């Protein structure tokens, strides 16, 4: 996985544009209400754009092909399995796609429950048993059922708004002299530094929520197909070679996850052993 998530990169670009516009226009956003509205506008823009373009971006990022008409038994099984799970979850049928990769992975994306995508790699289909692959598909369907794509978009928008608003307010105080006049250069420098620092904190919050969301998707898979199948799928991932990582927002909705140490704070997924332990503690969904 790229260190900078694609989903967050779009928002970072919006922050840069926001700074450039304010600098060129000389707007200091002295009115806190005006600044808050401006921060919300720019804070949510990148997230919403990423959400609405998520399916197109995902298909292009991994070269996935949507199965419009199954051409073989594997494709028929994939489509029928996702259809069955979607019906049990009271969801409209998502698009189903396959992408060619040795990576053992799958992901879900899309702007809404009515316009979603489940994609799976050829590497996963070769490496996992049918029961294990079924559990992985159920995990992705659970992401859609839980509305995780929209929830992450809203959270990211709020975090972006916070980063812009607070950094600008602090920068104004720091750059103002005793006469109440602000130094544009100091204001711009301080606001940029603070946005970077607060941006890291915001990313930590977003990734914490992403990890929490993975536990919910695992439980959703257990509800659809039984927890023993989901546990088997996660155990399979443990036994396989460390998988290649997906780019950007795809990683946040994929099945696997890695990293340790300080980088664990920026992990989109909990460690596999913790996910397995959480499933084993479920009393239902045998």
From Swiss-Prot:
<dbReference type="GO" id="GO:0005886">
    <property type="term" value="C:plasma membrane"/>
</dbReference>
<feature type="transmembrane region" description="Helical">
    <location>
        <begin position="4"/>
        <end position="24"/>
    </location>
</feature>
<dbReference type="InterPro" id="IPR050083">
    <property type="entry name" value="HtpX_protease"/>
</dbReference>
<keyword id="KW-0812">Transmembrane</keyword>
<feature type="transmembrane region" description="Helical">
    <location>
        <begin position="147"/>
        <end position="167"/>
    </location>
</feature>
<keyword id="KW-1133">Transmembrane helix</keyword>
<keyword id="KW-1003">Cell membrane</keyword>
<feature type="binding site">
    <location>
        <position position="139"/>
    </location>
    <ligand>
        <name>Zn(2+)</name>
    </ligand>
</feature>
<dbReference type="InterPro" id="IPR001915">
    <property type="entry name" value="Peptidase_M48"/>
</dbReference>
<feature type="binding site">
    <location>
        <position position="214"/>
    </location>
    <ligand>
        <name>Zn(2+)</name>
    </ligand>
</feature>
<keyword id="KW-0378">Hydrolase</keyword>
<keyword id="KW-0479">Metal-binding</keyword>
<comment type="similarity">
    <text>Belongs to the peptidase M48B family.</text>
</comment>
<keyword id="KW-0645">Protease</keyword>
<feature type="transmembrane region" description="Helical">
    <location>
        <begin position="186"/>
        <end position="206"/>
    </location>
</feature>
<feature type="binding site">
    <location>
        <position position="143"/>
    </location>
    <ligand>
        <name>Zn(2+)</name>
    </ligand>
</feature>
<protein>
    <recommendedName>
        <fullName>Protease HtpX</fullName>
        <ecNumber>3.4.24.-</ecNumber>
    </recommendedName>
</protein>
<dbReference type="GO" id="GO:0008270">
    <property type="term" value="F:zinc ion binding"/>
</dbReference>
<keyword id="KW-0997">Cell inner membrane</keyword>
<dbReference type="GO" id="GO:0004222">
    <property type="term" value="F:metalloendopeptidase activity"/>
</dbReference>
<feature type="active site">
    <location>
        <position position="140"/>
    </location>
</feature>
<dbReference type="InterPro" id="IPR022919">
    <property type="entry name" value="Pept_M48_protease_HtpX"/>
</dbReference>
<keyword id="KW-0862">Zinc</keyword>
<dbReference type="GO" id="GO:0006508">
    <property type="term" value="P:proteolysis"/>
</dbReference>
<dbReference type="Pfam" id="PF01435">
    <property type="entry name" value="Peptidase_M48"/>
</dbReference>
<feature type="transmembrane region" description="Helical">
    <location>
        <begin position="33"/>
        <end position="53"/>
    </location>
</feature>
<keyword id="KW-0482">Metalloprotease</keyword>
<keyword id="KW-0472">Membrane</keyword>
């Amino acid at each position: 996985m790229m260190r900078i998530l694609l989903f967050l990169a779009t928002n970072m670009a919006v922050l840069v544009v926001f700074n450039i516009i304010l600098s060129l226009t000389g707007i200091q956003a002295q009115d806190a209400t005006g600044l808050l509205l401006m921060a919300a506008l720019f804070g949510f823009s990148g997230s919403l754009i990423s959400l609405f373009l998520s399916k197109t971006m995902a298909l292009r990022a991994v070269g996935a092909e949507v199965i419009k008409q199954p051409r073989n038994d594997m494709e028929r099984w994939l489509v029928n399995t996702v259809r069955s799970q979607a019906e049990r979850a009271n969801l409209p049928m998502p698009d189903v796609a396959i992408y060619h990769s040795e990576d053992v992975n799958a992901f879900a994306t899309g702007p809404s429950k009515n316009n979603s995508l489940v994609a799976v790699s050829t590497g996963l289909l070769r490496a996992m048993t049918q029961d294990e692959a079924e559990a992985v598909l159920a995990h992705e369907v659970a992401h859609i059922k839980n509305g995780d794509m929209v929830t992450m978009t809203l959270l990211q928008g709020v975090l972006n708004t916070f980063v812009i608003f607070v950094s600008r307010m602090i920068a104004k105080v720091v750059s103002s002299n005793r006469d109440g006049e602000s130094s544009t250069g100091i204001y711009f420098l301080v606001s940029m530094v603070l946005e970077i620092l607060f941006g890291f904190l915001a990313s930590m919050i977003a990734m914490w929520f992403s990890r929490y969301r993975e536990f919910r998707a695992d439980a959703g898979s257990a509800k659809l197909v039984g927890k023993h199948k989901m546990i088997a799928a996660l155990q399979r991932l443990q036994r396989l070679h460390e998988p290649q990582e997906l780019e950007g927002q795809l990683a946040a909705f994929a099945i696997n996850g890695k990293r340790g140490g300080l980088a664990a704070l920026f992990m989109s997924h909990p460690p596999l052993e913790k996910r397995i332990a959480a499933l084993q503690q479920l009393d239902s969904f045998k």
